[in-house]
Amino acid sequence: MSRVAKSPVEVPAAVTVTLNGQSLSVKGGKGTLALEVHANVEVKHEGNVLTFTPRDGAKQSDALAGTTRALVNNMVVGVSQGFEKKLTLVGVGYRVKAEGNTVNLSLGYSHPVNYVLPQGVSVETPSQTEIVLKSADKQLLGQVAAEIRAFREPEPYKGKGVRYSDEVVLRKEAKKK
């Protein structure tokens, strides 16, 4: 069995887990998330503990059990505490402004870049060069952050662009004459 799947997921008191056949839903203070569990993975809900075991001895089933356990753990943490990602804009004239569910970015192009956030993701802009994205869904949050970063990825010579706040951009030396 997968080493990840061996450890059970503990469910806090504020989180409700519902299991209908192979569909699992997790409800908490930050929202509700759902997951379709693969047929080769068996989920047991006993008290405030979820355990995941493969239905057969196949190697793929072991891997699926570990993956499912990790996804469900992220769902439980997401609906109870939530996740956040911070992005930083580096460059002269690079600005960000949040209006409702739209992020307006000025990234040195001849036009402003408007990004509409999907449902379930909220945004804050503490300053004109910082973006804080928050969501209960870790996968969706990472996807949104990657899409915003892709508008102007950090370049290696001056480091200009949109980067994650903890990202280290490897710098190159300019060409010598």
Curated annotation (Swiss-Prot):
Alphabetical keyword list: Ribonucleoprotein, Ribosomal protein, RNA-binding, rRNA-binding
Stored PANTHER family: 60S/50S RIBOSOMAL PROTEIN L6/L9, LARGE RIBOSOMAL SUBUNIT PROTEIN UL6M
Listed InterPro entries: Ribosomal_uL6-like, Ribosomal_uL6-like_a/b-dom_sf, Ribosomal_uL6_a/b-dom, Ribosomal_uL6_bac-type, Ribosomal_uL6_CS
Protein name: Large ribosomal subunit protein uL6
Organism of derivation: Cellvibrio japonicus (strain Ueda107) (Pseudomonas fluorescens subsp. cellulosa)
Function: This protein binds to the 23S rRNA, and is important in its secondary structure. It is located near the subunit interface in the base of the L7/L12 stalk, and near the tRNA binding site of the peptidyltransferase center.
Pfam families the record matches: Ribosomal_L6
Biological process, per Gene Ontology: cytoplasmic translation
Coiled coil: none
GO molecular function: rRNA binding; structural constituent of ribosome
HAMAP family listed in its UniProt record: Ribosomal_uL6_B (MF_01365_B)
